[in-house]
Regions:
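Alpha-helical transmembrane segments and immediately membrane-proximal extracytoplasmic
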Residues: 1-300
Length: 300
């Protein structure tokens, strides 16, 4: 029931029933798809979406009418973008965890701590404006349209989000992550001379993929929100971001069932918040790989 509620909520908020069902399934465990919950997840997600639509709720939907043609220069930018978004997700998770631990350790009365955190947010709002409060849908839509935004907008939203979560220790993280991804994508597109709208859409889903370990759901989310033209590029970037973000997650109760790197040995089968990762040297021996491949063929 909890899973169905999660899938339904995602579908209602973002207007993405397929991605909602897959997101709820992927969020349970990293590296495993539980097929026995596919049907209830999809039923809950699709039903919630249809009910919301019947009630007249409008969703964030902006199909991209211009996507750069596939060529070598764009593909290299795409690879670099995926690494940038994964690195950003990695840093964001670590910063939220450390700031939460720090504020928890400060021996201050909790209501007073909330008052101080709220005062800090008000001060930042007076300096930088209200764009970084709330959902920020207008700014996200502007990024995807190719409008100019502050190059450090994603850092400001990250700061607002970190302060809020570290003080309150609760609150939505998905929409702020999407905001950070869209503005970071716009910044990356401008930095590399690429189309800012396209990379805003790619960053929108890629940072979420890295921060929550959900590359399949976020690839589908790109199709449902931005159209099929961006699908192959978004999928590549989401997978790279997923690999680059390491064995971390905004959802610390995710169960890790795979290692993302041959050079790391995490404790598999444990929740991410409880694992310890050990580095190991990676030796690539071509002859050993060829012998393993040949022995595998001879067994068939």
């Amino acid at each position: 029931m909890v899973l169905c509620g999660f899938c339904a909520g995602f579908a209602c908020v973002f207007g993405a029933p397929i991605a909602g069902a897959l997101f709820g399934i992927e969020i349970l465990a990293v590296g495993v798809i539980l097929y026995d919950v596919l049907l209830p997840a999809f039923v809950a997600s699709l039903t919630a979406y249809q009910v919301s639509s019947a009630l007249g709720i409008t969703f964030f939907y902006y199909p991209l009418h211009f996507v750069p043609a596939f060529e070598q220069g764009f593909f290299l930018r795409l690879l670099a973008g995926g690494m940038f978004f994964g690195w950003l997700a990695y840093l964001l998770i670590g910063t939220i965890q450390r700031s939460t631990a720090l504020t928890t350790a400060i021996p201050i009365w909790r209501p007073l701590k909330g008052l101080l955190g709220g005062g800090l947010l008000v001060a930042l709002t007076l300096v930088f404006g209200r764009d970084y409060l709330g959902l920020g849908l207008n700014l996200m839509e502007g990024c995807i349209k190719g409008d100019s935004v502050l190059p450090y907008a994603f850092l400001l939203k990250a700061l607002f989000t970190i302060i809020t979560l570290s003080i309150s220790r609760s609150g939505s993280v998905i929409t702020p992550i999407l905001f950070i991804g869209a503005t970071a994508g716009s910044f990356f597109g401008r930095l590399t001379g690429a189309d800012t709208g396209t990379f805003a859409a790619i960053g929108f889903v890629s940072v979420l993929a890295g921060a929550t370990n959900t590359p399949i759901a976020t690839s589908i989310l790109a199709i449902e929100l931005f159209g099929a033209d961006v699908a192959p590029y978004a999928a590549v970037s989401c997978v790279i971001s997923f690999l680059m973000s390491g064995h971390r997650s905004l959802y610390a109760s995710q169960v890790l069932t795979i290692s993302k790197s041959r050079g790391l040995e995490p404790e598999l089968g444990e929740e991410i918040q409880h694992i310890n990762t050990v580095s190991r040297p990676v030796r690539f021996n071509m002859m050993t790989r060829l012998r393993s491949w040949w022995h595998g063929r001879t067994r068939l």
